[in-house]
């Protein structure tokens, strides 16, 4: 099979990259676990130092956990604790996890929240700048969404009670929608104006996925807190948050923690090797180049098939949105194409609130020939279903 899912954006270095495997094996022979409250393993220290090299200079403190949801919860706890404010602003269509607080912040599908009410409070939802959904260009969408945010701060959550705004720079489960760069810049300015922390959830878009090590870099901004997971460990369970010293120092010993976060030396060694592979093998640059090649091919197919309403993305985080003739979301078409690709040994996933978007998430090691093969299979899948 040709895996263009990467385990939902996890195996960025490919399956069983030799350097990652070797790091895991070597670490297992020396130390498996060291609780960070007692002893910090050399692997964990080296991982923090490696991440320090790829984060903004203002970001110099790291906390490790096991899953994306844990890291999101940690970012919210830190924001609330540091600011002494309670509310968190999230965006429509977001996915931040399945634990209680993260689930309360997730709005991409009702299934993630169904029958789990009541959920933790202090969460306010703002419109995400989804230009295709609105039928506008990015400038119009940005202006509208920023006006709505301003209204929200006047009507639902005053700045002095808003701890943070959290955003996925590329909406993940909500449809693989990149936030316009001008929106990210305006959002940073809004947070600065009101002393609100900006959290970027890079769980799916980070670690080279979009052609930058972190997706927020495309906008030339610096967040206050970065959330990372998935591609960080090449399949091992690790996540983390990164922030500034003055924010992290609000966490006194015992304020937050966990047994396994940063404690598993094997996981830390694998994550360190993953970061090294991404950098040494120039996978960030490859993601940018192959992503451009992929989108060019998909746009050619869009010209031939009217069921493809939109092709969008950054790097190797690309979404193809399917619509019916009247422009409404069409999940049936997306599922049929996905199944036809599976029958041809190519793995793809759907996403979006209407489940009408096929997402392309190949490993960052993918080459031009494999992209071409994937596009060929995708074209066959469209033709099999007589999609014009």
Regions found by a protein language model. Name each.
Residues 1-388:
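Conserved N-terminal phosphate-binding loop of PLP-dependent enzymes in the Aspartate aminotransferase
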């Amino acid at each position: 099979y040709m895996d263009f899912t990467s385990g939902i954006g996890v195996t960025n270095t490919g399956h069983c990259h030799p350097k990652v495997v070797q790091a895991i094996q070597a670490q297992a022979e020396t130390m498996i676990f060291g609780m960070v409250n007692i002893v910090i393993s050399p692997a964990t220290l080296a991982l923090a130092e490696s991440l320090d090299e790829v984060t903004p200079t203002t970001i110099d403190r790291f906390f490790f956990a096991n899953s994306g949801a844990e890291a999101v919860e940690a970012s919210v706890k830190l924001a609330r604790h540091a600011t002494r404010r309670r509310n968190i602003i999230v965006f429509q269509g977001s996915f931040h996890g399945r634990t209680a607080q993260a689930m309360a912040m997730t709005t991409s599908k009702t299934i993630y929240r169904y029958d789990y009410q009541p959920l933790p409070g202090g969460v306010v939802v703002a419109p995400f700048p989804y230009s295709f959904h609105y039928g506008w260009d990015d400038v119009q969408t940005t202006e509208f969404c920023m006006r709505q945010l301003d209204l929200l701060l006047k009507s639902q959550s005053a700045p002095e009670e808003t701890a943070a705004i959290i955003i996925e720079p590329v909406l993940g489960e909500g449809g693989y929608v990149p936030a316009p760069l001008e929106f990210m810049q305006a959002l940073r300015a809004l947070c600065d104006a009101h002393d609100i922390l900006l959290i970027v959830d890079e769980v799916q878009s980070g670690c080279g996925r979009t052609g930058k090590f972190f997706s927020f870099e495309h906008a030339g901004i610096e967040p206050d807190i970065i959330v990372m997971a998935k591609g960080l460990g090449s399949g091992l369970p690790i996540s983390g948050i990164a922030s500034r010293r003055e924010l992290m120092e609000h966490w006194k010993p015992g304020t937050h923690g966990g047994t396994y976060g940063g404690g598993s030396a094997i996981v830390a060694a694998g994550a360190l090797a993953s970061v090294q592979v991404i950098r040494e093998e120039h996978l960030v640059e490859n993601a940018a180049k192959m992503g451009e090649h992929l989108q060019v091919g998909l746009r050619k197919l869009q010209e031939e098939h009217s069921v493809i309403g939109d092709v969008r993305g950054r790097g190797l985080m690309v979404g193809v949105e399917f619509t019916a003739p009247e422009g409404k979301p069409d999940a049936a078409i997306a599922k049929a194409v996905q199944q036809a690709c599976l029958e041809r040994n190519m793995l793809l996933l759907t996403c979006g609130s209407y489940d009408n978007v096929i997402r392309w998430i190949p490993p960052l090691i993918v080459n031009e020939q494999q992209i071409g093969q994937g596009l060929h299979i995708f074209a066959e899948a469209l033709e099999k279903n007589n999609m014009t």
